[in-house]
């Protein structure tokens, strides 16, 4: 029994990863945003749309512990910017309904300028 318990503890220690930093968790989101921005500058709007969608998806799946560390303005502000960028890419692709839906999500995030 002692060997089994030691084996379980050892296996847990080997597979457990250290807690990721806030920046490490946000890095994939930032990468998508940057790729989306570069694609927009290069007029590759379909690629930009994919990247902005992925950034939003990744941000919305962050652990609650990370999202609660963000104050309301930063959380809403971050998503607001990505929804706005997504709407811009969609409008360039002549996806009017999708662009309007993205703008509605932008407004729903609050703190609109």
Regions found by a protein language model. Give the residues of each.
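Flexible helix-coil transition and linker loops at the boundaries of alpha-helical arrays
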Residues: 21-23, 59-76
């Amino acid at each position: 029994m002692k060997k089994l318990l030691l084996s379980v503890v050892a296996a847990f220690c080997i597979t457990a990863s250290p807690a990721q930093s806030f920046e490490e968790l946000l890095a994939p989101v930032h990468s998508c945003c940057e790729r989306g921005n570069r694609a927009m500058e290069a007029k590759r709007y379909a690629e930009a749309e994919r990247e902005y969608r992925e950034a939003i998806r990744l941000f919305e799946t962050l652990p609650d512990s990370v999202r609660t560390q963000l104050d309301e303005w930063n959380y809403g502000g971050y998503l607001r910017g990505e929804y706005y960028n997504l709407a811009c890419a969609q409008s360039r692709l002549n996806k009017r309904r999708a662009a309007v839906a993205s703008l509605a999500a932008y407004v729903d995030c609050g703190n609109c300028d």
